[in-house]
């Protein structure tokens, strides 16, 4: 039992065991210790006011108000915050130490105040607490809130500061405060009904009694104190009264002894600042006066807003005189001397504050321990005698191997001893005064080191324990296999930690919350401590806690490495990969590599104290190798996506690359050879896309098999627009890529100029550099002299394959000259060595390459500088190229493919003109000419091609101009008005292409042909010229009106735009992508508190229900990864998932089992859907794979339909082609006929539950509301094992529940619900309600809106259906008569007379499709076929 007489024990309660380790930052540790100790000391000073307020009471008959300044008062909300946690002594000590009964009086709660706001002159001495009845603050007891110092999860309290503690009644510094201000502040929180002199004279140690009320004397005392100093100086008083009278500030008729006057002065006249800044003696008048003068001067410098006439008005003279008088009073000698005198008085009181606080602390403990001050002081002297030994022990502390205690235990014991003795002192100032060793800098430094060591060691232990608990084993082995089972029947969760972690897809959330935030925060502080105190710890014999530190530091590396290894191994097992699988893998790799790079960035800094640790270097290298493999696999997937993408990706190929740009720029710098892989792969992708565009153009040029000129024109316009859009986007991206990859230019050495070139390089202070790698290719590296001392920059210049463009050079960028002479050279300049990685540059003999850090857009600057040095000894060959031979090869391939595509497009016009000559396709041919000219001009402006390629395109354009002029004369009708407009355009283009020296590029034969055709076109123009205006005047208004639609039609045909379906698809994809992201984030938050793999206790009802599902034969264990959200409903949420064993995509329906929801009906519903799905095996019903049971959820694995749902399809409008509706209805009937033949009724047929797979096949899903007939129950029993039969016998009502109860329950969606379900009279015929629902779905497909669109609520809808009102049959323009008769058979009110699915398959509306009349058309819609070489292009 603790000794209450021991002040160290009592003080430990007062300090509330504040931990020394509340902060483990070694730099800020001393400051935090000072602040925490100061808070604890100030709470102990507040204790007296709390006790006296609870014991004492001042009678108040309601005659006087509680006059307290607003700054002290607290609101009711603040009072409510003074809870039991804050009120440390209000209840505990009242129960332990009850004051005498005669000392207690009735008290009323008022606003609590802080004792720091009390003036010492009016505070009652703590030694007289047994003799007082009334508190010195107000007429009611005032509870003082004791603010907690706060607890930490560490054990040692923070040491107090070296500053001397500030008294509880410190003076608040405020501008312009005077002595009477200070005195008045003390009175503002004291009652005017207290007679201080009477209290002091009547205080008797042995007993207490109530004091009589003497308000008049109290008022006199108050005001006598206020004006005492002025009464001592009659001259000053008279001067102040005369001045105040003139200023109307003091009225001679006022009674200055009136208490109301002081109240008003307290609330309005005086300003009390809340700034917690103590007044120092060094603060002089000069500071405040200087600041005041500066402020006044700044106000006077403001421009006046009044006019000069108003300022000079004699009527305003009185105001200026008054203001001048006010200024004279406040800036005169009287006020200045009074301010100085009051400051000196306040400064003299400051020295007495420390003694007062020490006495207050002493008297508090005397009161608590029921001892006198003298005896308690003697006891303290005896207890403090061991302080010197503890200080010496700390100064001499050194741990060695012979010590029986571990380093951390030895340090903790030493700090605990010091804490015990520190509690024996009221403040650190007292310790400093008594022990000079404690105040020494060496002692404080060693104490800081030991405290920091204790903090970081315990923090590391806590973090290691957290990670061990998370992983599940003491070794923190993430690959260790752990298995938990339920009664050895079925396994709920198994596998290593990395697989369980991978399965839940909480990678980003886990790393951000558990590793990146918490663990990295601890590691960074440990790193700072080790770096700061490494030498000190070594001198004290304390180890550097490297084991736990390195164990934590390597954990993220091992986890992310295993995660990537697992992902890559699973990807290798994928046999058939689809576009959806590629997107899922790309997204997974992208997120994982981001996390891995983030780990590398943060831990590069944290490894500094152990940079030579070989284990960490090996782990870093192994992680980098995995990242390299992941990056290569990432680009492999991009290649597959671009190569095997659907037609929708034709317009988005470049957007795919642009979307990956920012990610690659963030990841590749931190992967070894990352930029090299990125540059090579991106350039290869661009070249592959160019090849695809060229192949697409070649295939589509064969044209459609039709003679209709309108269809032919529309076909080719769409083809050319598609090529133009794809090529334009790709060239824009290629220009960006070219600027980052091409960082050099190449020159050829002129004949007999090699020696002169060498001489000029020597004279310009260039240095020959031996690299031991480039010399093998017959080349030499020459660098500027100022870069010799910067080898890292030179290595970056020579080995750089990708320039990020983030370098800002004030002058010439760093560069290197690679010289490949064709003969031997003699270098007379400086020579140095440079070790660089092996780089393949492939430079031709007799050439010079200028390599720089500048981008391709900045090469011109370095080229001019280089030419200024070498002069005319070289000539430019290639203005921009990549220094790496592999990347330059890819860029050359891109340029060659771009030129090939451009020439193919220019040749397309002649092909189209020849093929469709005489077929009235003049509009198409003219559009082709305009298209080719625009395309060629854009290509030359992109600066992708070199000079030779541009010259070749220019020659092609000249030939195109000649052919265009020939087309106008030979193929166009002279009387057509379009011919005149086309002729002007063709002649203008011919004029531009033959301008200047271009006319000399035409051979003689072509020039003669051009002259002839131009002459004929000019003659053609003369037929359309209307010089006198007679032709125009003769035109009628009807002809003009008739021409307007023609112009509109032509403009519309020339317009290139995307179709509505294509735009809608783009918008839909973007919206779905955003929705999936939001749902994925929501799912991660919901998985935060999961409990996986625990053993079930079958004694509880909930666990018994889970055991029923876990014991099912369909309970499977597979390795899978959860993907994005597909949809959610009231029964569960569906996600996309990947089978890690096979690589197949699947859908996972997650049913949450929160405890309020775990009931027998819920389990029966899950089990019922599971049994129903096990019965089915049909192309038009989703396949069922099995279930996976967890404590908090059940996962149902089903087939993934990747083509959205019928509901999403109908959101964009009705299906206009009735043949498509017939194909869809035939598939739905096939599926319903099979479902009904199994004895199951779906009971929830609606567009949301009809899905499309990737081939367009429709499938039924969501059998949560299905009803099973007797035949289905029999079939289920035939498939049961003996163990399952025993379980069903125990639960005999289960199948009855499936068979009967659901049939009579109101299940489904009201819009598609049959009348018998609403009326509660279901038919014995299986699936009759499904036929009604199918008819409603057909109505929605034909009309675009659900049945009864005008009924706005479910109640009116159900009432309408219950009245046997069928939906409105679509009109004749929406559905044929056969289709209308089909719907009438579906909407028969009597379910027994309603047609079945098998009967409807024989209906004339769908039977021809089933029999094969239209089967070819249906087959082509659902089977993927090779791209047609003669059909129309896919219209999106």
UniProtKB/Swiss-Prot annotation:
<keyword id="KW-0547">Nucleotide-binding</keyword>
<comment type="similarity">
    <text>Belongs to the protein kinase superfamily. STE Ser/Thr protein kinase family. MAP kinase kinase kinase subfamily.</text>
</comment>
<keyword id="KW-0418">Kinase</keyword>
<keyword id="KW-0067">ATP-binding</keyword>
<dbReference type="GO" id="GO:0005524">
    <property type="term" value="F:ATP binding"/>
</dbReference>
<dbReference type="GO" id="GO:0051403">
    <property type="term" value="P:stress-activated MAPK cascade"/>
</dbReference>
<dbReference type="InterPro" id="IPR050538">
    <property type="entry name" value="MAP_kinase_kinase_kinase"/>
</dbReference>
<dbReference type="InterPro" id="IPR017240">
    <property type="entry name" value="MAPKKK_Ssk2/Ssk22"/>
</dbReference>
<feature type="region of interest" description="Disordered">
    <location>
        <begin position="56"/>
        <end position="85"/>
    </location>
</feature>
<dbReference type="InterPro" id="IPR000719">
    <property type="entry name" value="Prot_kinase_dom"/>
</dbReference>
<feature type="active site" description="Proton acceptor">
    <location>
        <position position="1244"/>
    </location>
</feature>
<keyword id="KW-0597">Phosphoprotein</keyword>
<dbReference type="GO" id="GO:0106310">
    <property type="term" value="F:protein serine kinase activity"/>
</dbReference>
<keyword id="KW-0808">Transferase</keyword>
<dbReference type="InterPro" id="IPR008271">
    <property type="entry name" value="Ser/Thr_kinase_AS"/>
</dbReference>
<protein>
    <recommendedName>
        <fullName>MAP kinase kinase kinase win1</fullName>
        <ecNumber>2.7.11.25</ecNumber>
    </recommendedName>
</protein>
<feature type="modified residue" description="Phosphoserine">
    <location>
        <position position="224"/>
    </location>
</feature>
<dbReference type="InterPro" id="IPR017441">
    <property type="entry name" value="Protein_kinase_ATP_BS"/>
</dbReference>
<feature type="compositionally biased region" description="Basic and acidic residues">
    <location>
        <begin position="76"/>
        <end position="85"/>
    </location>
</feature>
<comment type="subunit">
    <text>Interacts with tea4.</text>
</comment>
<keyword id="KW-0723">Serine/threonine-protein kinase</keyword>
<feature type="binding site">
    <location>
        <position position="1149"/>
    </location>
    <ligand>
        <name>ATP</name>
    </ligand>
</feature>
<feature type="binding site">
    <location>
        <begin position="1126"/>
        <end position="1134"/>
    </location>
    <ligand>
        <name>ATP</name>
    </ligand>
</feature>
<dbReference type="GO" id="GO:1990315">
    <property type="term" value="C:Mcs4 RR-MAPKKK complex"/>
</dbReference>
<feature type="region of interest" description="Interaction with tea4">
    <location>
        <begin position="282"/>
        <end position="1123"/>
    </location>
</feature>
<dbReference type="InterPro" id="IPR011009">
    <property type="entry name" value="Kinase-like_dom_sf"/>
</dbReference>
<dbReference type="Pfam" id="PF00069">
    <property type="entry name" value="Pkinase"/>
</dbReference>
<dbReference type="GO" id="GO:0038066">
    <property type="term" value="P:p38MAPK cascade"/>
</dbReference>
<dbReference type="GO" id="GO:0004709">
    <property type="term" value="F:MAP kinase kinase kinase activity"/>
</dbReference>
<comment type="function">
    <text>Involved in a signal transduction pathway that is activated by changes in the osmolarity of the extracellular environment. Activates the wis1 MAP kinase kinase by phosphorylation.</text>
</comment>
<dbReference type="GO" id="GO:0005737">
    <property type="term" value="C:cytoplasm"/>
</dbReference>
<feature type="modified residue" description="Phosphothreonine">
    <location>
        <position position="226"/>
    </location>
</feature>
<feature type="domain" description="Protein kinase">
    <location>
        <begin position="1120"/>
        <end position="1406"/>
    </location>
</feature>
């Amino acid at each position: 039992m603790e000794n209450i007489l021991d002040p160290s024990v009592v003080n430990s309660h007062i300090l509330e065991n504040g931990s020394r380790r509340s902060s483990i930052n070694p730099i800020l540790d001393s400051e935090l210790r000072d602040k925490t100790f100061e808070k604890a000391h100030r709470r102990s000073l507040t204790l007296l006011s709390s006790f006296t307020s609870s014991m004492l009471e001042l009678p108040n008959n309601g005659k006087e108000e509680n006059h307290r300044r607003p700054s002290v008062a607290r609101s009711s909300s603040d009072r409510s915050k003074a809870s039991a946690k804050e009120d440390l002594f209000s209840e505990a000590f009242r129960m332990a130490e009850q004051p005498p009964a005669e000392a207690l009086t009735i008290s009323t709660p008022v606003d609590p105040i802080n004792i720091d706001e009390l003036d010492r002159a009016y505070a009652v001495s703590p030694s007289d607490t047994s003799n007082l009845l009334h508190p010195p603050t107000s007429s009611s007891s005032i509870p003082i809130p004791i603010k907690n110092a706060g607890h930490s999860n560490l054990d040692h309290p923070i040491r107090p500061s070296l500053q001397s503690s500030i008294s509880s009644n410190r003076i608040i510094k405020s501008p312009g405060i005077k002595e009477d201000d200070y005195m008045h502040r003390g009175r503002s929180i004291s009652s005017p009904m207290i007679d201080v002199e009477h209290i002091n004279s009547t205080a008797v140690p042995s007993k207490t009694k109530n004091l009589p009320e003497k308000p008049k004397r109290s008022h006199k005392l108050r005001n006598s104190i206020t004006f005492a100093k002025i009464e001592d100086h009659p001259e000053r008083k008279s001067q102040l009264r005369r001045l105040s009278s003139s200023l109307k500030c003091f009225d001679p008729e006022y009674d200055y002894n009136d208490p109301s006057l002081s109240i008003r002065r307290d609330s309005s006249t005086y300003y009390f600042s809340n700034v917690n800044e103590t007044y120092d003696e060094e603060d002089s008048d000069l500071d405040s006066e200087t600041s005041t003068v500066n402020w006044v001067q700044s106000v006077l410098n403001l421009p006046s807003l009044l006019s000069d006439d108003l300022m000079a008005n004699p009527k305003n003279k009185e105001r200026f005189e008054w203001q001048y008088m006010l200024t004279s009073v406040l800036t005169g000698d009287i006020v200045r001397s009074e301010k100085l005198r009051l400051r000196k008085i306040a400064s003299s009181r400051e020295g007495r504050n420390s003694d007062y606080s020490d006495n207050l602390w002493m008297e508090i403990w005397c009161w608590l321990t029921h001892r006198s001050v003298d005896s308690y002081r003697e006891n303290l002297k005896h207890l403090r005698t061991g302080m010197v030994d503890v200080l010496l022990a700390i100064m001499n502390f050194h741990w060695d191997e012979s010590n029986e205690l571990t380093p951390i235990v030895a340090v903790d014991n030493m700090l605990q001893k010091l804490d015990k003795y520190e509690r024996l002192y009221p403040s650190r100032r007292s310790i400093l005064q008594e022990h000079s060793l404690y105040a020494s800098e060496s002692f404080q430094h060693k104490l800081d080191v030991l405290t920091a060591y204790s903090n970081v060691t315990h923090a590391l232990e806590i973090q290691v324990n957290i990670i061990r608990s998370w992983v599940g084993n003491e070794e923190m082995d993430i690959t260790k296999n752990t298995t938990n089972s339920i009664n050895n029947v079925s396994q709920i969760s198994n596998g290593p930690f990395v697989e369980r972690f991978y399965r839940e897809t909480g990678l980003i959330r886990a790393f951000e919350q558990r590793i990146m935030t918490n663990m990295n925060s601890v590691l960074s502080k440990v790193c700072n401590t080790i770096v700061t105190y490494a030498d000190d710890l070594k001198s004290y014999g304390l180890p550097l806690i490297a084991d736990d530190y390195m164990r934590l530091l390597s954990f993220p590396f091992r986890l992310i490495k295993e995660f990537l290894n697992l992902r890559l191994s699973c990807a290798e097992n994928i046999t058939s990969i689809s576009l959806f699988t590629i997107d899922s893998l790309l997204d997974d790799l992208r997120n994982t590599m981001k996390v891995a790079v983030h780990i590398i960035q943060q831990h590069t800094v944290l490894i500094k104290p152990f940079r030579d640790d070989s284990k960490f270097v090996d782990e870093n290298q192994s992680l980098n190798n995995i990242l390299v493999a992941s990056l290569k696999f990432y680009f492999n997937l991009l290649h597959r996506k671009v190569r095997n993408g659907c037609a929708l990706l034709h317009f988005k190929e470049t957007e795919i690359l642009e979307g990956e740009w920012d990610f690659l720029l963030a990841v590749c710098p931190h992967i070894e050879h990352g930029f090299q892989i990125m540059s090579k792969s991106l350039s290869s992708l661009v070249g592959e896309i160019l090849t695809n565009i060229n192949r697409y153009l070649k295939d589509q040029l064969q044209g459609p098999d039709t003679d209709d000129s309108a269809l032919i024109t529309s076909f080719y316009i769409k083809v050319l627009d598609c090529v133009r859009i794809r090529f334009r986007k790709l060239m824009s991206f290629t220009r960006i890529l070219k600027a980052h990859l091409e960082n050099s230019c190449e020159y050829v050495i002129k004949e007999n100029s090699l020696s002169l070139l060498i001489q000029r390089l020597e004279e310009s202070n260039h240095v020959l550099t031996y690299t031991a790698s480039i010399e093998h290719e017959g080349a030499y590296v020459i660098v500027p002299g100022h870069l010799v001392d910067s080898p890292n920059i030179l290595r970056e210049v020579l080995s750089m394959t990708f320039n990020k463009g983030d370098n800002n050079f004030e002058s010439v960028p760093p560069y290197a000259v690679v010289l490949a002479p064709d003969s031997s050279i003699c270098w007379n300049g400086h020579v140095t060595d440079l070790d660089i990685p092996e780089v393949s540059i492939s430079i031709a003999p007799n050439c010079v390459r200028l390599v720089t850090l500048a981008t391709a857009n900045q090469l011109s600057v370095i080229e001019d500088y280089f030419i200024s040095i070498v002069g005319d000894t070289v000539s430019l060959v290639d203005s921009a190229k990549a220094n790496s031979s592999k990347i330059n090869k890819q860029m050359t391939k891109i340029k060659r493919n771009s030129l090939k595509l451009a020439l193919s497009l220019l040749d397309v016009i002649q092909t189209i003109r020849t093929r469709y000559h005489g077929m009235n396709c003049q509009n198409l041919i003219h559009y082709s000419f305009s298209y080719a000219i625009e395309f060629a001009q854009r290509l030359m402006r992109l600066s992708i091609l070199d000079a030779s390629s541009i010259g070749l395109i220019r020659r092609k354009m000249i030939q195109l101009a000649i052919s265009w002029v020939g087309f106008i004369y030979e193929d166009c009708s002279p009387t057509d008005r379009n011919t005149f407009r086309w002729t002007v355009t063709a002649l203008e283009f011919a004029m531009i292409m033959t301008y200047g020296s271009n006319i000399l590029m035409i051979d003689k034969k072509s020039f003669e042909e051009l002259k002839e055709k131009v002459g004929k076109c000019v003659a053609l123009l003369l037929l359309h010229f209307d010089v006198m205006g007679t032709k125009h005047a003769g035109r009628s208004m009807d002809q003009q009106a008739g021409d307007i639609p023609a112009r509109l039609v032509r403009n519309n045909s020339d317009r290139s735009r995307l179709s509505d379906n294509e735009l809608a698809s783009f918008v839909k994809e973007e919206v779905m992508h955003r929705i999936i992201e939001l749902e994925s984030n929501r799912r991660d938050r919901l998985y935060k508190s999961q409990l996986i793999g625990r053993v079930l206790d079958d004694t509880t009802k909930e666990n018994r229900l889970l055991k029923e599902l876990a014991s099912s034969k369909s309970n499977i264990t597979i390795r899978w990864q959860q993907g994005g959200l597909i949809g959610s409903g009231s029964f569960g949420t569906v996600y996309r998932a990947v089978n890690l064993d096979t690589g197949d995509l699947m859908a996972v329906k997650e049913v949450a089992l929160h405890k309020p929801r775990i009931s027998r009906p819920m389990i029966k519903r899950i089990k019922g859907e599971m049994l129903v799905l096990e019965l089915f095996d049909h192309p038009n019903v989703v396949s069922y794979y099995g279930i996976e049971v967890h404590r908090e959820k059940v996962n149902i694995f089903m087939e993934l339909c990747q083509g959205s749902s019928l509901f999403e399809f109908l959101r964009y409008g009705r299906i206009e082609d009735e043949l498509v509706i017939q194909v869809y209805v035939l598939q739905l009937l096939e599926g319903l006929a099979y479902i009904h033949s199994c004895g199951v009724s779906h009971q929830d047929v609606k567009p949301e539950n009809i899905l499309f797979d990737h081939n367009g096949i429709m499938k039924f899903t969501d059998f949560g509301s299905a009803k099973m007939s007797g035949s289905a129950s029999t079939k289920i029993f035939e498939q049961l094992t003996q163990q399952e039969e025993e379980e069903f016998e125990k639960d005999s009502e289960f199948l009855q529940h499936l068979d009967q109860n659901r049939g009579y329950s109101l299940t489904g969606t009201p819009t598609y619900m049959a009348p018998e379900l609403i009326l509660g009279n279901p038919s014995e015929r299986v699936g009759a309600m499904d036929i009604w629902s199918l008819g409603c779905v057909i109505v929605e497909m034909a009309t675009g809106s659900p049945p009864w669109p005008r009924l706005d609520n479910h109640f009116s809808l159900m009432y309408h259906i219950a009245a046997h009102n069928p939906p409105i049959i679509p009109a004749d323009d929406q559905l044929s008569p056969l289709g209308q008769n089909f719907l009438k058979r579906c909407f028969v009110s009597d379910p027994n007379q309603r047609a079945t699915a098998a009967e409807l398959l024989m209906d004339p509306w769908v039977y021809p499709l089933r029999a094969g009349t239209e089967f070819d058309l249906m087959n082509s819609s659902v089977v993927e076929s090779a791209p047609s070489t003669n059909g129309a292009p896919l219209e999106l």
